[in-house]
Amino acid sequence: MTPPAPAASSVPPETGARQQRVAVYGICEEGTGKDGRVLLVRAAPHLTVAGQWFLPGGGLDHGEDPVDGLRREFREETGLAITVGPLLGILSDVFTLPDGASLHTLRIVYAVDGHSGELRDEVDGSSDIARWVPLDQALDLPLRPYVLRALTELRGD
């Protein structure tokens, strides 16, 4: 007897190295309407995405709770202590790295309900500038694709 054909899959065929990354990000806003601002950080010059803007956050350490990871990333990238709000969603993307490897990233996105401390830029890290950006200007910046999705699909208005 011939075994049944495998079911169709949305996963691309394996042709090279495959990597997976789990990361956590926060949408931190101040004000409302035309006075609303969102906190963004800019990718540092040593990164391949230098100059692009992203939400504060980043990769989780092995075994790290996403809420703890988000608090850590905000301290590192902005100097702020945060109160993590509700989960807004999980974004998934797959793209090919310059070396040909396929990278699948799961991005856990939370609302940030509050913050304290003084905003500062990260030194010698993955970002070089942390800024409050008016919402109406944020979409005109060179944003990482997931940031555009997070700001337009996940945040409530």
Give residue ranges: language-model regions:
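Acidic, metal-coordinating catalytic segment for phosphate/diphosphate chemistry
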Residues: 1-25, 31-32
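A generic structural micro-feature
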Residues: 16-20, 52, 100-106, 124-127
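Conserved hydrophobic "DFG−1" position in protein kinase catalytic cores
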Residues: 28-29, 40, 112-114, 132
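Short, solvent-exposed loop/turn segments that connect beta-strands within catalytic domains
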Residues: 31-36, 48-50, 99-102
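Conserved Nudix-box catalytic region and its N-terminal flanking loop in Nudix hydrolases
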Residues: 36-76
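A short coil-to-beta-strand element that immediately follows conserved catalytic motifs
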Residues: 81-90
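Active-site-adjacent beta-strand/loop module that shapes the phosphate/pyrophosphate-binding cleft
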Residues: 91-119
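NUDIX/MutT-family hydrolases
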Residues: 111, 120-153
